[in-house]
């Protein structure tokens, strides 16, 4: 306790920031912001852009903090997560709960004030889906945790779209579907090269419950499905040739990784595939944004 109290403000700030899983939060918020821009042919009002971004970030951070709290014993048993302040006991349970409550409350107020009630309630529902349904119920109980629980993690584009329009039309759900289908292969390649970690922690990830070969096959199958799903923005008319070209090229690389993992697996290859999957989603959504504003100029 004395060591906790004696830490510098900068160190404490870093520890609390770590609870929000900044890199994961950044990707989620990025997809939400893209959803905002795709929802309007012009520019997103600054009030909505700033308020929506801050509110979604705060509620996402609150959800990740609860995740760290619930999984602190599990995290302590895994090399990948043993460094987290919650796993090391550097932040107490009451402190994490208070931190999450403050972030969540400010985030909800920000969304209600600067966007609309629908965005606030959808984001709160996403918080519950991740922090409660996925973390408490699905992750420790079923190898399909990522498939089912991926619904909450796929919501950011819909949240961004709702922030601008007050509605969630079909095009927004296409973006949600892309992230939903992307989630299993993204996490399963991680679970493959971290399978010992998950096994030691007692988590029923797919490589632990069904074996490596089964997981490799499903990574390939889901990546094929993902390739098809990413064509939907073009087919629906939401996006044009710039996006289509990007989706095909990015998807071809992802498919190549999935095929190599299926045929000739190595932990090093899985690590590369995991890193690429993050780059893939970021570039795919960036392509949606570029296409959205380039399409009227290029006429394609």
UniProtKB/Swiss-Prot annotation:
Keyword Iron in record: no
What does the record say about its membrane topology?
Answer: Multi-pass membrane protein
Keywords, comma-separated and alphabetical: Cell inner membrane, Cell membrane, Heme biosynthesis, Membrane, Transferase, Transmembrane, Transmembrane helix
Q: GO: which molecular function terms?
A: protoheme IX farnesyltransferase activity
- InterPro entries to which the protein is assigned, alphabetical: Protohaem_IX_farnesylTrfase, UbiA_prenyltransferase, UbiA_prenylTrfase_CS, UbiA_sf
The enzyme's first-digit EC class, named in words, is: transferase
Localization, per the record, is: Cell inner membrane
Q: Name one Pfam family in it.
A: UbiA
Q: Where are the transmembrane segments?
A: 24-44, 48-68, 94-114, 118-138, 146-166, 172-192, 217-237, 239-259, 278-298
User: Which pathway or pathways does this protein act in?
Assistant: Porphyrin-containing compound metabolism; heme O biosynthesis; heme O from protoheme: step 1/1
Q: Which reaction does it catalyse?
A: heme b + (2E,6E)-farnesyl diphosphate + H2O = Fe(II)-heme o + diphosphate
| BP terms from Gene Ontology | heme O biosynthetic process
Instruction: Give the primary localization class.
Output: membrane
Protein's job: Converts heme B (protoheme IX) to heme O by substitution of the vinyl group on carbon 2 of heme B porphyrin ring with a hydroxyethyl farnesyl side group.
Question: Member of which family?
Answer: Belongs to the UbiA prenyltransferase family. Protoheme IX farnesyltransferase subfamily.
Q: What else is known?
A: Carbon 2 of the heme B porphyrin ring is defined according to the Fischer nomenclature.
Identify this protein by name.
Answer: Protoheme IX farnesyltransferase
């Amino acid at each position: 306790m004395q060591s906790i109290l004696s830490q510098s403000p900068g160190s404490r700030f870093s520890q609390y920031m770590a609870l929000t899983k900044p890199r994961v939060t950044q990707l989620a918020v990025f997809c939400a912001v893209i959803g905002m821009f795709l929802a309007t042919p012009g520019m997103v009002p600054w009030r909505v852009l700033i308020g929506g971004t801050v509110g979604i970030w705060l509620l996402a951070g609150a959800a990740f903090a609860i995740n760290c709290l619930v999984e602190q014993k599990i995290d302590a048993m895994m090399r990948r997560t043993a460094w987290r302040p919650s796993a090391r006991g550097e932040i107490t349970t009451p402190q994490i709960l208070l931190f999450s409550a403050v972030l969540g409350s400010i985030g909800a107020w920000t969304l209600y004030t600067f966007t609309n009630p629908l965005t606030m309630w959808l984001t709160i529902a996403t918080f519950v889906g991740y922090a409660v349904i996925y973390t408490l119920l699905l992750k420790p109980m079923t190898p399909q945790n990522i498939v089912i629980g991926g619904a909450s993690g796929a919501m950011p584009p819909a949240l961004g779209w709702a922030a601008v329009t007050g509605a969630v039309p079909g095009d927004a759900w296409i973006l949600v579907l892309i992230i939903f289908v992307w989630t299993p292969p993204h996490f399963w390649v991680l679970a493959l090269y971290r399978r010992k970690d998950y096994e030691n922690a007692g988590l029923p990830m797919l490589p632990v419950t069904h074996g490596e070969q089964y997981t490799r096959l499903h990574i390939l199958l889901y990546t094929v499905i993902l390739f098809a799903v990413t064509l939907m923005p073009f087919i629906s008319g939401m996006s044009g040739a710039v996006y289509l070209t990007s989706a095909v090229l990015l998807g071809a690389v992802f498919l190549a990784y999935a095929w190599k993992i299926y045929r000739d697996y190595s932990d090093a290859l899985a690590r590369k595939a995991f890193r690429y999957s993050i780059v893939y989603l970021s570039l795919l959504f960036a392509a949606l944004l570029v296409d959205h504003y380039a399409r009227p100029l290029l006429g394609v």
